[in-house]
Amino acid sequence: MGEEEEKKEKGDEIITAVYKVHLHCRKCACDIKKPLLRFQGVQNVDFDLEKNEIKVKGKIEVVKIHKQIEKWSKKKVELISPKPSEVKKTTTTTTTTSVVEKKTTEIKKDVIRTTVLKVHIHCAQCDKDLQHKLLKHKAIHIVKTDTKAQTLTVQGTIESAKLLAYIKKKVHKHAEIISSKTEEEKKKEEEDKKKKEEEDKKKKEDEKKKEEEKKKEEENKKKEGEKKKEEVKVEVTTKTITQVVEYKEIVKVEGQKDKDGNIPYFVHYVYAPQLFSDENPNACRIV
């Protein structure tokens, strides 16, 4: 009798369960809310479009409502609270525990991937139809289209081959896979890109340093060359000055007066005889 009373008390407890579902608009949320309010034991249903959450309050069985929401929405539903471990404790039968264990293992196994497809999108109506029909699938979470590039990006747990078949069946369009990557692969690619960027930056910095060193060496060489030129110029100028001084001194000696005050005869400078000069070969000739 004591065990039966405990079971009744557990069944009479008011629970607030939170489920995560992709809610496209208020109409989608209302389509789930109306049948939930008719469900046995449900007292209140609230939904949050921004967080994509549905809150169900009442004397309810969490697993059954989980199944019903998946059935009505035709989408993947995640149980946020109470956690699957708590649900196992509250349930009395072994069947409910096995269902929860299966669902937790399925959630762990499911890998979220983003596939980019090339599809012909004719107009805005085609775009809306594509998104509407693809979001009906349970394994598709987010759909984005680009009319200019004629591409379709799908995020979810669906495999690429199944996605192609689903598009051909429901939308009647031929699609080609451009890329299909999981979240782990994306993270690895981002890390590789960051490493490459860092390496490129280091290489550029090293090249800049080398160029600066070369420029400094060239400038030093130029400065040394200019100093040498200045030294040579100084030597040349000193030589010319000495020659001029000597010439002036000779002139002064010739122009001095005697003791009596008589000025001697001024000797005129005469060109040297060019009879045997190499500069004028025609000087010596027979007339």
Swiss-Prot record:
InterPro entries: HIPP4/7/8/17/18/19, HMA_dom, HMA_dom_sf
Residues with PTM Cysteine methyl ester: 284
Protein's UniProt keywords contain Repeat: yes
Region called Disordered, residue ranges: 181-232
Protein name: Heavy metal-associated isoprenylated plant protein 4
Entry superkingdom: Eukaryota
Keyword annotations of the record: Coiled coil, Lipoprotein, Metal-binding, Methylation, Prenylation, Repeat, Zinc
GO terms, molecular function: metal ion binding
Binding residues annotated for a metal cation 1, in chain numbering: 25, 28
Coiled coil residues, start to end: 179-235
Gene that encodes it: HIPP04
Lipid modification (S-farnesyl cysteine), residues: 284
Keyword Lipoprotein among UniProt keywords: yes
Similarity-based family: Belongs to the HIPP family.
Binding of a metal cation 2, residues: 123, 126
Gene3D superfamilies reported in the protein's UniProt record: 3.30.70.100
PANTHER family attached to this UniProt entry: HEAVY METAL-ASSOCIATED ISOPRENYLATED PLANT PROTEIN 4, HEAVY METAL-ASSOCIATED ISOPRENYLATED PLANT PROTEIN 7
CDD domains: HMA
